[in-house]
Amino acid sequence: MSLIDPRAIIDPTVILADNVEVGPWSIIGAGVEIGEGTVVGPHVVLKGPTRIGKHNRIYQFSSVGEDTPDLKYKGEETRLVIGDHNVIREGVTIHRGTVQDRAETTLGDHNLIMAYAHIGHDSVIGNHVILVNNTALAGHVHVDDWAILSGFTLVHQFCHIGAHSFSGMGTAIGKDVPAFVTVFGNPAEARSMNFEGMRRRGFSEEAIHALRRAYKTVYRQGLTIAQAAADLAEPAAQFPEVAVFLQSIQTSTRGIIR
């Protein structure tokens, strides 16, 4: 049984699973579907088409599933898909997609989106991602699993943030961030790798040392990307972690931060 505050406004087409809670003065529009155990706090606005999974918590003053302000958007039906076990804190804004891309913005599972963060249209957020307060993602941004973007990080449209990467506070990202790399500054510069995060997540010391050597190959030896990639082929075959790092470099479309 769901617990709906009588002061909430819910469109009759909304689909609510069991044990959903909706707080006072929240507005849930047509085309929204909410999974079991999700809690929608007070003063939240949800607009469809939006599908929200199980056991999420959305805090007050968040706007989730609103139309994109992208000038290409002409009212086409687009959607937002949110997975399970996400925490969306106060004042977060998440926009639906555009038909010029996938027509879908996606947020995976077990993510923490902190206060006043923004996720732009057509962005794809993986799992276990943390967006700290006031981080803003432009449209078409991809953020891979376990990335952490510190407060006031700004990400240009179409950038790709690699798995396990980390940005310092106030970083302005205009190119792709390879997996595991830490970036700081405006404009962003690569400083090291997220070794502390790797240890917390149980990476072996052998894998960490291999990634350290791979980082030096790309960032400290004055090689071109093609030359560095050739040098990393052998360690990538030995260590899956190095293969992930190498793939994030080779598949970059905007060029990597160096």
UniProtKB/Swiss-Prot annotation:
What is the organism lineage in this UniProt record?
Answer: Bacteria, Pseudomonadati, Pseudomonadota, Gammaproteobacteria, Pseudomonadales
An example GO biological process term is: lipid A biosynthetic process
- Please state where this protein is localized: Cytoplasm
Pathway listed for it is: Glycolipid biosynthesis; lipid IV(A) biosynthesis; lipid IV(A) from (3R)-3-hydroxytetradecanoyl-[acyl-carrier-protein] and UDP-N-acetyl-alpha-D-glucosamine: step 1/6
Catalysed reactions listed for this entry: a (3R)-hydroxyacyl-[ACP] + UDP-N-acetyl-alpha-D-glucosamine = a UDP-3-O-[(3R)-3-hydroxyacyl]-N-acetyl-alpha-D-glucosamine + holo-[ACP]
Entry's family note: Belongs to the transferase hexapeptide repeat family. LpxA subfamily.
InterPro entries hit by this protein: Acetyltransf_C (IPR029098), Acetyltransf_C_sf (IPR037157), Hexapep (IPR001451), Hexapep_transf_CS (IPR018357), Lipid_A_LpxA (IPR010137), Trimer_LpxA-like_sf (IPR011004)
GO MF annotations for this entry? acyl-[acyl-carrier-protein]-UDP-N-acetylglucosamine O-acyltransferase activity
Give yes or no: UniProt keyword Cytoplasm.
yes
| Functional summary from the UniProt entry | Involved in the biosynthesis of lipid A, a phosphorylated glycolipid that anchors the lipopolysaccharide to the outer membrane of the cell.
Q: What is this protein called?
A: Acyl-[acyl-carrier-protein]--UDP-N-acetylglucosamine O-acyltransferase
Q: Which UniProt keywords apply?
A: Acyltransferase, Cytoplasm, Lipid A biosynthesis, Lipid biosynthesis, Lipid metabolism, Repeat, Transferase
Subunit structure comment from the entry: Homotrimer.
